[in-house]
Amino acid sequence: MNIEIINPSEDQYGNRKENIFLAFGDAGNYLGSAYTYPTINYHQTYETPYLIFVAIHMADDMDKVLSDEVMQMLFDKMFARANEIRMQNPDLKARIYAGFEQDKDKLDFYIKNGFEEDYSIIMDADIPHNFTYMLPESVNVEELKLDSDQEFMKYKLLYDEIFVTPLDGNAYTEQSQQKYFKNLSFIVDDKLVGGCTIFEKDGFGYVETVYVLPEQRGKGLSKIIVNYIFNYFLSNGINKTRLEVWELNKCAVELYKSFFYNEVEKNLMFPVITL
């Protein structure tokens, strides 16, 4: 089979078309896709601030031999582009990395292609039954409802600037269907300063995200948000909480430890090449 890999005709989901690769077979049938996406993030990974995310998605129900061939071809195109992107900021230490992958075969694929192991940490904490918290009068909390594509894209642009893994629309939709789901914005003087997404999963109050805008950091807002989250969970009868954080995000790890989160497990989640 002849395999053709092309760029899309236009930018997609806030990413440049040159960073996206689509694979098709002889009959024009879709075989898979890959993309790379750069961001500069001094807050989460200050030692390697230039982050270049890569991802591969294969079509369903493909023959394994064909799937392996297409995946390698997509990887080669994507990785070459990631290295081109890296050279756009040669003065910064960079990481080319894959995101959260539950597929062990795909994780092994990245390792086989020269990526090194990197880990996320699962952390749990108990919320004391007598825990109470009053939000400061200067802080308002608003629920963010993404009822249109335009609203989702606005949120995605914000999310992708803050977090090391771009927002996945399907994953967000799945989370939004969980019990007690909230996407919250924290407002001071009518301006967004931070936010979080939370829900109940497997009996835990799950903290998917906590963020503070770069210009608002150092003011204790992260602790305000986490305290608010604890109070929200406890008000809904949930007294234990769980989250997952990149091991390299030392600021976040220390924040959660200050709330008595303890490490319970490590996952190979971010295969990486440091340049």
What are these regions (language model features)?
Residues 7-82, 193-205, 213:
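Conserved donor-binding loop and adjoining core beta-sheet/short helix segment
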Residues 66-84, 212, 218-235, 253-258:
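Conserved acetyl-CoA-binding loop-helix of GNAT-fold acetyltransferases
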Residues 121-147, 244-250, 260-262, 267-275:
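C-terminal "cap" of GNAT-fold acetyltransferases
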Residues 2-13, 39, 140-155:
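A short beta-loop-alpha structural element at the N-terminal edge
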